[in-house]
C-alpha cells in the first residue's frame, strides 16, 4: 500500500511540474502599448495568450551532474567582500528564453552574493538573474520580480540556479533530482517586461546545510538578492520590486516583506505575493507527518541544527536508528527523491518513545523556542507595501488557519493585506494535490496583483473581513 501511495505522490508531483512547464510552451500574454496594466482574461490571469517562446533548437540536454554535488562557481572566496547584497561573481546561465546567453532578451546569469544569517554573520548565497523578453508596457521603469522558490529540497544540487537551462539537474552520487518547476512563472514575468531575480536561499547550492523554512534567513537572502540583482543589472537601488513565492517561497516572500523596512529600507517594494506560507512551523509539522512529503521535516530539522549546535544532542535523545537514518538521508535530498524514499512515513516510528516529531517539538522548550523564532508576523510585523496572501481551505500540506492568522497579525499591525482562500474541494488528502494545484491556478491572479502594484493602482484589502 505504501509503495502505491509513494508512486501516486510522485505522479502528482510530476503532473504539477509538467503542468507548470506547459505554461511555458503555451505562452503568455504581453500587454499592449498602453500605460495600463495587462487585462486579465476570463480566468483573471495574464498567463494565457499568444506569446510564443523563441523557436530555436535546444542543444542536447544535460543537467548538472556531480557525484559530490560540488561546483566551483558556488564556493565563495575565503574573505567575502563588504556589504549586503554584494555580487561576488556571475556566470552565464543558458535557459529556454535565450540558449546562447548572449546578453540579449531572455538571457540569464547566475550570481553569487553576500547576505547575513540569523546570527548576523556574513555568508554567501546564490541565485539567477533573468532579463525580460518582452517590453514593459506599464507605468514607470521596468520592475524587478524577486522570486523565492517553493520547496526544492536540501541538497546543493536542488538549487534553482544550478539547473541546466534553468530546468533540471541531477546528482549522480545520491540520485537527487532538481526539477525547476517554477521556471514557467519566471518566464511569464520576463515576457511581461520584468527583470526576474530568482534566489536560491542560504545553503541551497552554496556550502553548508540549507536552512529550510528559516524565515529569518530567507527574508535576508531575498532582500539581499534584490540588492544584488538590481546592482548586477545596473539599475538604481530604488527601482520598483515585488516579491513572488508559493509554499516555502511564500514564507520567504512574506519574510522579506516584513523585514524590508528594517533590513533594506532603501528598496522600493511595491507589493508581495505570499502563497500558502508555512508561517508557523509547529503547526505545519503535524500536517506533513505520515504524508507524501514527510521528508520536509528532515529538511527543516537539519536546517535548525545547522544554526543551533546546542540542539544536536536531540537526535540521540529522541531518535531511534530509523530516525537518525531519516535525518542523515534528508540532508542532501531534493523533494522528488525524498518522496520516493520517505513518503507516508509516520514519524512515531522514528522516535524512541513513539511520540511524533510534532509532539516532541511542542514539549521540548529548546526546539520549540527555535521553531517559534521562525514564525512569521511575530518578531517582525510591519509591512511597508501591500501583500496578497492565498491559502487553500483544504490545503493538506500548509494549514489554512495558520496562514489566515498570519495575515490577521499583519492587518493588526497596519498592513494592507488581501487574504484569499482557494476553494478547491478536498482531493486525496496527503497527496499534495490540494497544495500543488492552487500554485498553478493562483499564479495568474498573483501576477496580475503585482502588475497592478507596479502601476500604482490602489491595493485591495479585506482586513477584518476574513
Regions from the PLM with identified roles:
Residues 30-136:
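Catalytic-loop region of hydrolases
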Residues 227-297:
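Primarily recognizes the serine-hydrolase "nucleophile elbow" in alpha/beta-hydrolase
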Residues 117-126, 130-192:
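Short, surface-exposed "cap/lid" segments of acyl-processing enzymes
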Residues 181-184, 191, 212-233:
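Alpha/beta-hydrolase active-site loop
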Residues 41, 46-71, 78, 278-380:
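Accessory cap/linker subdomain of secreted extracellular hydrolases
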Residues 383, 388-395:
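Short beta-strand/loop motif that positions the catalytic acidic residue
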Residues 385-386, 399-409:
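Short alpha-helix in the alpha/beta-hydrolase fold that links the catalytic acid
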